[in-house]
A protein has these predicted regions:
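Structural signature of nuclease core domains in nucleic-acid processing machines
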Residues: 1-110
Length: 110
């Protein structure tokens, strides 16, 4: 895993395991796109949909702040670039922040 804390890697690993179960989803981790490396990207076969997920560890009570930070990072670093280059028209950005058993997520469709 690229440049992440061990806590972020833990949550990212769990998500990768869950998301990789779908046979028609192409799931990749730490893929270079735009100005950096996105945590998780998913291309849903034959649907024209791409998903970019950024995972953050949050201190207790700071989950919303970290969700917004994750979404800003996706946009600022243009992690959807690769999908647009491939002609994918529907791209979903997920910011996810976790602290122990508490996770908060928000999605933007671009």
């Amino acid at each position: 895993f690229v440049q992440h804390s061990r806590k972020e890697n833990f949550y990212q690993g769990i998500l990768l395991g869950i998301l990789s179960y779908k046979s028609d989803w192409i799931v990749r981790s730490n893929r270079e796109s735009g100005e950096g490396f996105s945590d998780i990207t998913i291309r849903i076969s034959n649907s024209g949909t791409g998903i970019v997920i950024e995972v953050k560890y949050a201190e207790a009570g700071h989950e919303e702040e970290m969700v917004q930070k994750a979404l800003r990072q996706i946009q600022d670093k243009d992690y959807g670039y690769e999908f647009r280059q491939e002609g994918i028209r529907r791209i979903l950005y997920y910011g996810i922040a976790c602290n122990k058993k508490v996770c908060r997520a928000e999605v933007l469709e671009v």
